[in-house]
Amino acid sequence: MASGFLLWPVLLVSFSVNAVEPISLYNLFTSAVNRAQHLHTLAAEIYKEFERSIPPEAHRQLSKTSPLAGCYSDSIPTPTGKDETQEKSDGYLLRISSALIQSWVYPLKTLSDAFSNSLMFGTSDGIFDKLEDLNKGINELMKVVGDGGIYIEDVRNLRYENFDVHLRNDAGLMKNYGLLACFKKDMHKVETYLKVTKCRRFVESNCTL
């Protein structure tokens, strides 16, 4: 795992006792937000790189269809807008964030294998480990904040059947284009939800969605 992701073990020591010092919780929230921002940035870069690799004619065809139609994670009950997000509890938003991350375990493994020789993943080594690391941090936050009292079906073993590794035709190209668009969208959601939960507990100047 990359050295930049070795902070969790130090921070998690504070959770072994009953009382959690505010500064430790603040640092844990800050680390989670920073990691979510990093993953969202990576997702956007990978998406742009894929767009640049598409032939002009294929790109014109793809532009006629929404790449976000039928995202795999649509089955996860995420808030649909700013107002609904603000209405949800911190625990709920953390639980939803964890579910979104877990839903990408299989697709990201497949995606990484498919584009292992591409510049698309040249700047995102260990992206799977980064997802796992962020999820561990969110789970530790839920030990303190709670999980919103909601049950979400385990999404780790589900499969993203629309993913086409071999890009055999335009249909396969569209599937992969859609997959990357969905990944970017979901990482943006996770970043947003973590920012909201942090801002509620530690009043900051930038709390807007």
Swiss-Prot record:
Functional note: Growth hormone plays an important role in growth control and is involved in the regulation of several anabolic processes. Implicated as an osmoregulatory substance important for seawater adaptation.
Designated name of the protein: Somatotropin-1
Region (Disordered): 59-87
Localization, UniProt: Secreted
UniProt GO BP: animal organ development; growth hormone receptor signaling pathway; positive regulation of growth; positive regulation of receptor signaling pathway via JAK-STAT; response to nutrient levels
One family name in Pfam for this protein: Hormone_1
Source species of the chain: Anguilla japonica
Binding, Zn(2+): H38, E191
